[in-house]
Amino acid sequence: MKFGQARQWGGVAQSLRFLWNPRSVRKSVSLFAIGAMLSVTIAACGGNNASTSSGSKDVELTLVGYAVPKAAHDAIIPKFVEQWKKEKGQTVTFTQSYGGSGSQTRAIVDGLGADIAHLALAADTDKLVKAGLVNPEWQAKTQNGGTVAKTVAAIVVRPGNPKNIKTFQDLARDDVKWVTPDPKTSGGARWNFIALWNDALKRNNGDETKAKEFVAKAYKNVVVLAKDAREATDAFAKQGQGDALINYENEVILAKQQGAKLDYVAPETNISIDTPVAVVDKNVDKHGTREVAEAFVKFLFTPEAQAEFVKLGFRPLDTATTTKENTDKFPTVKNLATIKDFGGWSEVQTKFFADGAVFDQTIATDKQ
């Protein structure tokens, strides 16, 4: 790679904001980068009394999330604060913490006092259920089963797509090398793996033996199996490794909005990457914030809030945002699977990502 190209892709690396483990971030992290960052959004002057009774007392909410939806939250929160102030006469202050979904989940389990959790996958929310922090019926209690934003898997390619990569099948070609995080350490990488698995099943009439053969061949072409998505981004964009990188489509769109010059493909056979939001029941009852926390979660599903998610690259979730103007912005996905098609995250985690499961078998085949 020429020096000029390296500088260009270095800029892209700064723009592509993935999930990653905050311990991997050592230096030069901006306020919009993905690390374990803690920022406070002040709605208005006042104290931070946790009471949720209507009146002059202020209330503070702690919103903990994986890093990707931060920009959307930053746009949505002031709208909710204004509405709540008008309806209840209360000033709401948000403390926000963002980082890798897995690390944020562990932090909540270990005592980070989240009132609301917006994580990368329902499997992480289920860990909060197992820890006794979230009601086991959280999906039934939350609109749309808790899914508040959705995207698909995208293949980021070199400028002009010189290898003519169009589908996940192309990642198994002998002339294609690619980069991805390790599904054993990265929540986002688990979506990547399932996207490839889904594609292989669809092409082979549900034959899991052939699907295993495909993913094994594809992962044999992985030049960097990074511990987290930030490391994968750096390997692809800064170090020039590989011909392709799998990322969330919304992240690529957001990077392009911020000036990054990059190309991507959204394969027509894809997986719906559904990100859940939940009230952390034990904490809201402890803090006395249930009323406002539940109201904020409900607000996230309003057309006004959903429009902000769509502006930042998430695919339309409801009928109000599923307009021709919005849908025309996205490449057509003709065959879209959901995690429910594979039994839900609990079953997927056991079948694919537990020790000795399908992913480990894939890597073992790769090493043979």
Residue map of PLM features:
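Bacterial N-terminal signal peptides that target proteins for export
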Residues: G4-F32
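Extracellular/periplasmic juxtamembrane helices and adjacent flexible linkers that interface
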Residues: R17-W20, S30, V284-Q368
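C-terminal motif of bacterial Sec signal peptides marking the signal peptidase cleavage site
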Residues: T41-A44
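N-terminal segment of the mature folded domain
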Residues: A50-T185, K367
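Sec-exported extracytoplasmic/periplasmic mature domains
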Residues: P78-K86, V109-G113, A122, V129-L133, ...
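Ligand-binding cleft/hinge of the Venus flytrap
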Residues: K79-K88, Q169-D234
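Short helix-loop capping/hinge motifs at secondary-structure junctions, enriched
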Residues: G160-K166, T185, N198-G206, N283-E291
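Ligand-binding pocket segment of bilobal, Venus flytrap-like solute-binding proteins
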Residues: R203-T269, P276
